[in-house]
């Protein structure tokens, strides 16, 4: 698919971001994801326990956060070159990331995201979906392993 089509179907600016979901996850899936991003990407993680920024996510702190019902604030930014993927550690039942579509300027940017999504899908052995913000039912892309499906409007 060409960049112009991708821009108009996925990365258009409507005032909202795009969400990335891996649904029906558990703590093991999250640990797999944390190990993947810690090994492959530049990270900026806010450790809510120490109130410090760190370059690696400490999964034991995330598990503690979940046990304390979210009393610690914790987010992470994963950098795919110039693209920032934000991660929210709400609970272990789904992995949720979000992206700002305005950061996507080229087919290369799209391909960087696709590479990340494929790695996540393969590592967790689960489907990854990209949706409109807060709309998991409105799927823009599905990734299963190396298979990428763009849902045309």
Protein language model regions, located:
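Residues that cap or initiate secondary-structure elements
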Residues: 26-28, 82-84, 93, 103-105, ...
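Long, contiguous N-terminal structural blocks used for assembly/anchoring
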Residues: 1-65
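Short, intrinsically disordered low-complexity segments
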Residues: 43-99
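Short secondary-structure boundary micro-motifs
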Residues: 4-7, 60-62, 70-72, 112-115, ...
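Acidic, proline/glycine-rich low-complexity IDRs
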Residues: 1, 102, 107-153
């Amino acid at each position: 698919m060409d960049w112009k089509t991708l821009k108009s179907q996925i990365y258009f600016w409507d005032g909202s971001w795009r969400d990335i979901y891996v649904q029906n996850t558990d703590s093991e899936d999250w640990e797999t994801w944390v190990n993947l991003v810690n090994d492959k990407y530049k990270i900026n993680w806010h450790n809510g326990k120490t109130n410090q920024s760190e370059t690696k996510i400490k999964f034991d702190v995330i598990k503690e956060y979940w046990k304390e019902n979210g009393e610690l604030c914790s987010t992470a930014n994963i950098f795919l070159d110039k693209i920032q993927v934000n991660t929210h550690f709400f609970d272990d039942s789904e992995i949720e990331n979000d992206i700002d579509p305005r950061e996507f300027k080229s087919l290369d940017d799209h391909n960087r995201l696709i590479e990340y999504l494929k790695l996540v899908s393969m590592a967790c052995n689960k489907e990854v979906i990209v949706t409109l913000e807060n709309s998991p039912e409105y799927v823009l892309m599905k990734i299963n392993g190396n298979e990428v499906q763009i849902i045309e409007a």
